[in-house]
A protein has these predicted regions:
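N-terminal active-site segment of His-dependent metallophosphoesterases
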Residues: 1-58, 130
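Catalytic-core regions built around general acid/base machinery
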Residues: 58-70, 156-163
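Conserved catalytic scaffold of divalent metal-dependent phosphoesterases
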Residues: 81-157, 198-199, 205-206
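Metal-dependent catalytic neighborhoods of phosphoester/phosphodiester hydrolases
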Residues: 16-18, 43-63, 77-97, 147-148, ...
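Conserved beta-sheet core of the metallophosphoesterase superfamily
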Residues: 148-205
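Short loop/turn motifs at secondary-structure junctions
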Residues: 35-36, 108, 163
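Short acidic, glycine/proline-enriched helix-loop-strand junctions
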Residues: 62-73, 179-189
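Active-site neighborhood of phospho(di)ester-bond hydrolases with catalytic His/Asp-centered motifs
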Residues: 7-9, 39-44, 72-79, 84, ...
Length: 207
C-alpha cells in the first residue's frame, strides 16, 4: 500500500500567532489517524524571534511525537529555522538546501531546503523523472505578492514545468491555492495537507 504523506509548515513556535505545541501534537495525531504513514515538516517550525531555551525543546517534542506516529519523518527547513541549532531525533531525515529528489514509498519528492534568511536563490528545477507519483515540496514565496519576505522565488509556470502531480508550499501563513490542476498551494499556519499517491490528490486535514 503506498504511503500517504502528511505535510505541515509554519508552526512558528515562539511567535504570538503560532497555533502552538498542543495544536501541533493534536494535528500529528489526526494525520496518523487519517491513515498517513509519512510526515514532512516544510519549514519554519520555530520563529526567528523565539526564545531558544523554551522553543527548541518544543521542536524536539513535536518531532519526537512524529517519529512515534509515522513510519518516516522528514524536515525541510524554512528561512526562520536557519537562526537556531535545532535538536533532531536521529530518525528524522533533515534535507539538503540543494535541489534533490528522495523517495517516500512509491512517491518521488522534489525539494530544496531554505539555507538562509532571506534565501534569494533562484532554483533550477529538474523535469519529472518517471511516471511514478511526483510531489514537489518547497518553502517558497513564489512570486511574492502574498508574502512579507522573499524566499526561494520562482513562478507558477516554473513549478508547472517540472510536471509534478502537486506542489505543496510553506512560507505563506494563509492556506492559499495558486492552481488546482495540478495543485499548487501553501499549507498555511495552523493547517495540514495530505497527499494521496494513489490519486495524486491533495486534501486539507480537517481542523
Amino acid at each position: 500500500m503506498p504511503a500517504s504523506i502528511f505535510v505541515f509548515a509554519d508552526l512558528h513556535l515562539g511567535h504570538p500567532d503560532s497555533p502552538g505545541l498542543r495544536w501541533a501534537l493534536q494535528e500529528l495525531e489526526a494525520a496518523a489517524n487519517s491513515g498517513a504513514t509519512a510526515c514532512v515538516c516544510l519549514g519554519d517550525i520555530i520563529d526567528r524571534n523565539a526564545t531558544a531555551s523554551e522553543c527548541v525543546p518544543q521542536v524536539r517534542t513535536v518531532l519526537d511525537r512524529a517519529v512515534e506516529l509515522f513510519n518516516e519523518v522528514h524536515f525541510i527547513s524554512g528561512n526562520h529555522d536557519t537562526h537556531d541549532e535545532l535538536d533532531f531525533p536521529p530518525e528524522v531525515t533533515v534535507h539538503s538546501t540543494q535541489v534533490h529528489t528522495f523517495q517516500i514509498g512509491e512517491t518521488t519528492v522534489l525539494s530544496a531546503a531554505a539555507a538562509t534568511d532571506p534565501d534569494l536563490r533562484r532554483l533550477q528545477l529538474p523535469p519529472r523523472p518517471s511516471d511514478a507519483p511526483f510531489l514537489g515540496l518547497l518553502h517558497s514565496s513564489v512570486t511574492g505578492e502574498f508574502s512579507h519576505a522573499i524566499c526561494l522565488p520562482l513562478s507558477v509556470d516554473q513549478l508547472r514545468a517540472c510536471g509534478a502531480d502537486a506542489w505543496i508550499l510553506g512560507h505563506v501563513h494563509s492556506p492559499l491555492t495558486l492552481a488546482d490542476a495540478p495543485f499548487i498551494g501553501w499549507v498555511g499556519m495552523g493547517n495540514g495537507l495530505l497527499f494521496d499517491p494513489d490519486t495524486c490528490h491533495v486534501t486539507r486535514l480537517p481542523n
